[in-house]
Each structure stands twice: as structure tokens, then as C-alpha cells.
A protein has these predicted regions:
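Divalent cation-coordinating acidic motifs and surrounding scaffolds
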Residues: 1-194
Length: 194
């Protein structure tokens, strides 16, 4: 674990894409590992990048050898909820076009990302992976810094009975006056939403 962006970039540059082409995978094992095998610091930014070219077992994909669910018995939606409750944000990187070849995969990964406040990010070439990772980390850290600064005052006003829309409007105006900007990961949307 590190908070050094150059170290993250250097490590990512050593990775390469290989394998693939087979059906549903043990996605729940990766999610469970992020929850139980990592020693998360209490007040740190907690981001998990789940890179996938196939869906998990048990979501109704054709040819799934474990159609009733993951062989480890874990429920991926429950794991996503547990991540959210622990403050872990899940960014799912969809290796394309492989992932879109499945009927339910992109909807599934979009859903578990959303549960945790993360995003589903399409990735058409592995060469862009380092940019996706660094962009995700910078966006999350930037937003958390802003939340730490304004969150307590906003929470106090809302819990004190102030109108949420009015508080949001005032905060927006203050941030505009300060010329406050946040970093935001942007990417071309290649998935069609139903």
C-alpha cells in the first residue's frame, strides 16, 4: 500500500495483459480479499480497482459452471455493500470488448461500483491502465480533501434543519467564488445504457 502516485505509476507500468477468453470468474474472491486480507488504515482513502474481462459466477451468463453463484458462497452485492459500509470505493475497469460480450456483465459491474460510490470505467487498451488508476486515485483524494474541509459545517447546517437545496446552493456559490476546482476522471462512454 502506498500514497505515492509515482510509485503507483511505476508499478502499473510493469503489468501486462494476458490470458482471458474464458467465462465467468471468481470475482467474489477478489472482493472478499479486499475486505479481509488488506490492512486498511482507519482515516485513509480506500480505493479498490477491480479489473475484469469477465463477469462473476451466478449472474445468469451462458455457460457458467457455477450458475447458482460463486463456489465460495459469497454474494457480490453483499460484498459491495460491506465495502461501502467500510468506506471503500470500488472502481471497476471493464476490459473491452471482452466484457461487453457478456449479456449482464457491464450492468453488474456498474451496479457494484455505484453501491460503493465508484465508477465503471471502460478500457479498450491496456496501455491506458496507469492513467485510469492514477486518475481514479486523484479524483477520490481531491473529493475527500474537499469533504474534510466543508463536510462538518454542511452536516451541522443540514442536521440543524436548514434546507438541503439551500445549503448546496450556498456551498456551490462559495466554491465558485474561491475558484475551487476538483479533479474528475473523464472517459468516453462506450456502454449503452438500457
Amino acid at each position: 500500500m502506498t500514497n505515492s502516485v509515482p510509485e503507483i505509476q511505476a508499478t502499473l507500468k510493469t503489468l501486462f495483459a494476458s490470458g482471458g477468453g474464458d467465462g465467468p470468474e471468481a470475482v467474489t474472491a477478489a472482493m472478499k480479499s479486499a475486505l479481509s486480507d488488506l490492512d486498511w488504515r482507519q482515516n485513509s482513502s480506500k480505493i479498490v480497482l477491480l479489473i475484469a474481462d469477465a463477469p462473476p459466477h451466478g449472474i445468469g451468463e451462458y455457460g457458467d459452471g457455477f450458475a447458482t453463484g460463486s463456489p465460495d458462497g459469497e454474494d457480490p452485492l453483499q460484498l459491495a455493500r460491506e465495502m461501502a459500509s467500510r468506506g471503500i470505493t470500488l472502481f471497476c475497469v471493464a476490459c473491452e470488448p471482452a466484457l461487453s460480450g457478456y449479456q449482464f456483465a457491464t450492468d453488474f459491474f456498474r451496479a457494484i461500483s455505484k453501491i460503493t460510490g465508484g465508477l465503471l470505467i471502460p478500457l479498450a487498451t491496456a496501455d491506458l491502465l496507469a492513467h485510469v488508476v492514477v486518475g481514479s486515485v486523484l479524483e477520490m483524494m481531491n473529493l475527500e480533501s474537499l469533504i474534510m474541509e466543508v463536510g462538518p459545517a454542511v452536516g451541522e447546517r443540514v442536521h440543524g434543519g436548514s434546507d438541503v437545496d439551500e445549503v448546496a446552493r450556498e456551498l456551490h456559490e462559495k466554491l465558485l467564488l474561491r475558484q475551487e476546482e476538483t479533479k474528475s476522471l473523464s472517459f468516453e462512454r462506450i456502454h449503452v445504457r438500457a
